[in-house]
Amino acid sequence: NLEQEINALHCELKEKIYQPAPLKQFIIRDPKTREIHASAFRDRVAYHAIVNVLEPIYEKKFIYDSYASRKEKGTHKSIERYDSFQLRVSKNGQLINKPDTNNNIVGYALKADIRHYFASVDHEVLLSILRRTIKDEHVVWLIKKILDNFETEINGKGMPLGNLTSQFFANVYLNELDYFVKHHLRAKYYLRYVDDFVILHQNKKTVESYHERIICFLKSLNLELHPDKTKIIPLRNGLTFLGYRNFHYHRLLRKSNVRTYKKKILREQELMKKGLLSQEEIMQHLQGWFGYAQWANTYRLRQEIMKKCGLKKPSSLDA
């Protein structure tokens, strides 16, 4: 009985006897291998309730250019914002005229990734950040219960991928970095999506200074930048961000993403020949991928894939 379950959950929370159920672990490969942990349904009800209360409070604190797990934000808004930033990186901050060649494009970007971010979140640091805003210790107790329910090799560290609370707390934690970059470094062209972030500036030495100071600041959060995924890149070379290779006046898909999807299509065609997959199911998969691909210059690529599949052209191909 749903009403009885909700009442029981309410009593457990009120009496501080609530204990989340063990997380269910499973692996996804699409294409990167990730370990996902799913909460029980009744726990998800509690987690949604706490996020529904805290989210409006923290939305007022989050910077504009944080794009993950927020209403009216997301991947595509982030890419659009990046486009506007790179068009404005010039000495006087005005729009750059369309260049004849990429060599005419000025500016640099610090493209950075935080190493093992979700596994590295320090519970005590997170709770101290939350306590600045949350004065109700009952709420803090519940948050601690949620954090402690995720068992890791290092006690007091890490959040599970797949939980709504993890996505929300990930933004709260890195809001510290956002404020440091915007208010201490005074970086004008900065945006973040989860643990990936970009800072643009015309001057390379300024970008190098940002890099060094961010490395020092992240120590206060017990975090570090990923050495292989953090680079300073001339904007004329294009920047790979959120699955796209972004240039000033065009955008491409990452080559690895295209290769992976073409292999997937070949596998699905074999399954269709064996009667294990219908044409309608393949079409659904294609429509989902086209939704991602149409944000880049991929018209010919989408035509090629449709031709290989022997399928009619979908409306999304026209975009």
Per-segment meaning from a language model:
Residues 1-7, 318-319:
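Non-catalytic, polymerase-adjacent accessory regions of viral genome-replication enzymes
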Residues 5-8, 12-16, 20, 65, ...:
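Conserved polymerase palm-domain catalytic core
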Residues 13, 17, 30-32, 42, ...:
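Generic hydrophobic/packing signal
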Residues 20-45, 61-74, 149-171:
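Short, conserved non-catalytic motifs in the polymerase core
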Residues 27-29, 59-62, 108, 152-153, ...:
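Short acidic (Asp/Glu) and glycine-rich catalytic loops that position anionic groups and cofactors
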Residues 39, 48, 208-209, 225-319:
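Right-hand nucleic-acid polymerase module
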Residues 47, 51, 55, 72, ...:
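Well-ordered mid-protein domain cores that form the structural environment of catalytic cofactors
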Residues 54-61, 297-300:
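Short helix-capping/linker segments at secondary-structure and domain boundaries
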